[in-house]
Amino acid sequence: MIVYFSGTGNSRFAAEFLSKQLNDELLDTGRHMKAGEKDTLHSDRPWVFVAPIYAWRMANVLADYIRSAELTGSKDAYFVLTCGGEIGNAGQYAAQLCKEIGLNYKGVLEVVMPENYITMFNAPGEEESRAIVAKAKPVLEQGGELIRKGKDLPAHKVGLLDKLKSGPINEGFYKFYVKADAFLATDA
């Protein structure tokens, strides 16, 4: 089962792409999160969790959802993380999550998509966005093939800066910048 959270559509695109490639069931957690539901999910096939990177880690809302859900059936878990540039050391945190809830971590796939965190970064234009998505498709295809075969995704090379970004810098971003609060636009 492909379980995803998407804030702006990049992760939804990746999840739908993989769902078609793998002929696997798709679950949009957004509706479930809004309803405050604690889900019981079953999959005989590997779990594929798809989410955006928020400050070099998987979005906390999906990690929290995964922790709260009762997952039965398969014990294998893959993570497909969409980002504007890179995922830092997000794989380590996904592996820790798997250990916490009793799943077998099968790796993380970094999928570069158009930047959309416009409060801090510039979004690319339409032509550049199309080129970025075109480059993401073969990455998704290759990752999907490994998932289909039950193989681990290739290890993501992690350096000291990646550890800092996904560790203390992530915590600072969440404290000061990453907000999911509702916002309002006025004519003022």
Regions found by a protein language model. Give the residues of each.
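FMN-binding flavodoxin-like domain, especially the glycine-rich phosphate-binding loop
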Residues: M1-I2, S6-A14, K20-M33, E37-A51, ...
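Cysteine-centered iron-sulfur cluster-binding motifs in ferredoxin-type domains/subunits
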Residues: D181-A188
